[in-house]
């Protein structure tokens, strides 16, 4: 049997992940995802999560952000998680599987969300990446606009939005839009984000009603 040689890119991927301290720590702590550390950094910087908060986690699979948040808000809080892909069961979390860009599914989740007051909307959503930045960003901002629509609909006046974005095409336009909706807006790049990644996280506070 002749084994195919791994491509240079796959070798680089293996090397990068083998040497990644966050992946090592994730495995040690048995966490659901590497992105757990990104949210932890954001929270330690901004002091967002408190006991009893109600939180919406969009693009939740595999559950790293929900896992972190659950410990911060305690049993008196509530988490609604949503993803286009199924997510492994996580106790005390309400999970809906579906596509937020589908209008019928969006109506379905609003029926649930409207029953409660929400303190935080967080989104780690990312589109399928093709590698062409203009297309990737365009698809990203289509999803991000839906996240913004959900946030405006459900957030309390002193609520937070945490959302991942890609820098580059369309970024400044989206930032202008988000600054028109929230009182305070910050751009944050966690240490856990890879150096060559275009991702940044926006922390917005005080939704204008």
UniProtKB/Swiss-Prot annotation:
Protein's job: Specifically methylates the uridine in position 2552 of 23S rRNA at the 2'-O position of the ribose in the fully assembled 50S ribosomal subunit.
Annotated keywords: Cytoplasm, Methyltransferase, rRNA processing, S-adenosyl-L-methionine, Transferase
Domain of life where this protein originates: Bacteria
PANTHER family recorded: RIBOSOMAL RNA METHYLTRANSFERASE, RRNA METHYLTRANSFERASE 2, MITOCHONDRIAL
Family membership: Belongs to the class I-like SAM-binding methyltransferase superfamily. RNA methyltransferase RlmE family.
Organism the protein comes from: Buchnera aphidicola subsp. Cinara cedri (strain Cc)
Cellular location(s): Cytoplasm
UniProt xrefs under InterPro entries: RNA_methyltr_RlmE (IPR050082), RNA_MeTrfase_FtsJ_dom (IPR002877), rRNA-MeTfrase_E (IPR015507), SAM-dependent_MTases_sf (IPR029063)
Gene name tied to this protein: rlmE
EC code(s) of this entry: 2.1.1.166
GO CC aspect terms: cytoplasm
Active site (UniProt): 164 (proton acceptor)
Record-given protein name: Ribosomal RNA large subunit methyltransferase E
Positions contributing to S-adenosyl-L-methionine binding: 63, 65, 83, 99, 124
Source lineage: Bacteria, Pseudomonadati, Pseudomonadota, Gammaproteobacteria, Enterobacterales
Keyword S-adenosyl-L-methionine: yes
Record-linked SUPFAM superfamilies: S-adenosyl-L-methionine-dependent methyltransferases
Known catalytic reactions: uridine(2552) in 23S rRNA + S-adenosyl-L-methionine = 2'-O-methyluridine(2552) in 23S rRNA + S-adenosyl-L-homocysteine + H(+)
Main location (coarse class): cytoplasm
GO molecular function: rRNA (uridine-2'-O-)-methyltransferase activity
């Amino acid at each position: 049997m002749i084994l195919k040689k791994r491509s240079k890119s796959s070798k680089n991927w293996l090397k990068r992940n083998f040497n990644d301290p966050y992946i090592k720590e994730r495995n040690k702590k048995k966490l659901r995802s590497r992105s757990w550390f990104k949210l932890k950094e954001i929270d330690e910087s901004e002091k967002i999560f408190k006991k009893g908060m109600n939180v919406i986690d969009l693009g939740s699979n595999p559950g790293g952000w929900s896992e972190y948040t659950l410990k911060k808000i305690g049993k008196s809080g509530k988490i609604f998680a949503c993803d286009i892909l199924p997510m492994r069961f996580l106790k005390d979390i309400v999970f809906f599987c579906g596509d937020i860009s589908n209008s019928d599914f969006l109506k379905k989740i609003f029926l649930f969300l409207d029953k409660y007051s929400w303190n935080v909307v967080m989104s780690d959503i990312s589109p399928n990446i093709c590698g062409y930045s203009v297309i990737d960003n365009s698809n990203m901002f289509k999803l991000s606009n839906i996240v913004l629509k959900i946030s405006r609909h459900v957030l309390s006046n002193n609520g937070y939005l945490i959302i991942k974005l890609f820098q580059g095409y369309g970024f400044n336009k989206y930032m202008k839009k988000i600054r028109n909706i929230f009182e305070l807006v910050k751009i944050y790049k966690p240490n856990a984000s890879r150096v060559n990644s275009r991702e940044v996280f926006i922390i917005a506070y005080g939704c204008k009603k």
